[in-house]
């Protein structure tokens, strides 16, 4: 029986074999009347996670008239040591009546997912939380038999840019990418639109990360960006330029961190010098007071005074 997702769906992957990962999947869950589940597919000694769309639920067959959904899901790979180390990924998914069963890859998990000291694998279990961030209904039921492609053109919620379906807010960024790197997707193999959209969202997410101040980026942010670049590259995108930019940002981050360390050392040295200055001033004031006390002439009576 599918679970209707209100805010969160928790999947605990149990009895994981670190040396021989095996494919597994969550129980089905419902989002906006559609059936989904999460797949964990082994890749080497790690896992890749996929959202799998499984069609309209039996109890919601009224959705089979022309309709389209846009749902934003947040996947969190929980870290048992520190919440700050948890891996959080947002994905924009689009599905409609005519879309067959389709798997949407998420950003690959951290390289140390199964490491004993990383905090993700606790008692041979990994916990994944799926949250519905937003849900948008694009179009409504009608009787004219209009298919989802016509409905998409009418609502203009998604725009095609060089074969990629993107949101209106992403159009200028995607166009700019293709203007500067027209061959970026020339070797991308034929794939379903949902997968192409996922890859483009990951690419835009990497660029957004690199546009932040180096001082605001953590090492984890940059590690995740490296994994994401590899993910996009494996999808057939030519992202040598992005790898160079990532390397450049990492170098800037290193320089900023080193600069912070030097500044901190200088501030500590300055604080010590200031304290030494204050200590010397106290000594100087005491010496001046002693000097004033000693530098007093004897009076006539003082000279005549007997001991």
From Swiss-Prot:
CDD domains xref list: MATH
Key word Coiled coil present: yes
Biological source species: Arabidopsis thaliana
Chain ranges of the MATH domain: 6-132
Full protein name: MATH domain and coiled-coil domain-containing protein At3g58380
Keywords associated with the record: Coiled coil
Residue ranges that the Swiss-Prot or TrEMBL entry lists as coiled coil: 238-290
Gene3D superfamilies (alphabetical): Apoptosis, Tumor Necrosis Factor Receptor Associated Protein 2, Chain A
Coiled coil as UniProt keyword: yes
């Amino acid at each position: 029986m599918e679970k209707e997702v209100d805010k969160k769906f928790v999947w605990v992957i149990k009895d994981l074999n670190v040396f021989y990962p095996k494919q597994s999947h969550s129980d089905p869950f419902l989002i906006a009347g559609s059936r989904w589940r999460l797949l964990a597919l082994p890749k080497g000694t790690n896992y890749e996670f996929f959202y799998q769309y499984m069609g309209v639920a039996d109890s919601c067959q009224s959705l089979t008239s022309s309709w389209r959904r846009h749902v934003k899901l947040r996947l969190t790979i929980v870290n048992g040591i520190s919440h700050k180390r948890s891996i959080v990924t947002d994905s924009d998914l689009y599905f409609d009546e005519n879309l067959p069963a389709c798997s949407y890859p998420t950003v690959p998990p951290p390289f140390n997912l199964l490491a004993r000291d990383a905090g993700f694998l606790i008692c041979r279990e990994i916990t994944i939380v799926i949250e519905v961030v937003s849900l948008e209904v694009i179009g409504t039921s009608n009787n004219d038999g209009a298919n989802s492609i016509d409905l998409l053109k009418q609502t203009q919620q998604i725009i095609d840019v060089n074969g990629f379906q993107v949101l209106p807010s992403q159009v200028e960024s995607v166009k700019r990418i293709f203007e500067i790197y027209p061959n970026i997707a020339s070797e991308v193999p034929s794939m379903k639109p949902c997968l192409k959209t996922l890859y483009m969202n990951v690419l835009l997410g990497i660029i957004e990360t690199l546009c932040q101040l180096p001082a605001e980026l953590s090492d984890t942010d940059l590690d995740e960006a490296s994994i994401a670049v590899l993910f996009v590259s494996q999808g057939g995108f030519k992202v040598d330029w992005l790898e160079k930019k990532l390397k450049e940002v990492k170098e800037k981050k290193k320089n900023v961190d080193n600069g912070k360390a030097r500044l901190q050392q200088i501030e500590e040295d300055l604080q010590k010098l200031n304290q030494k200055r204050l200590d010397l001033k106290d000594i100087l004031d005491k010496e001046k007071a002693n000097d004033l006390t000693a530098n007093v002439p004897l009076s006539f009576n003082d000279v005549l005074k007997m001991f």
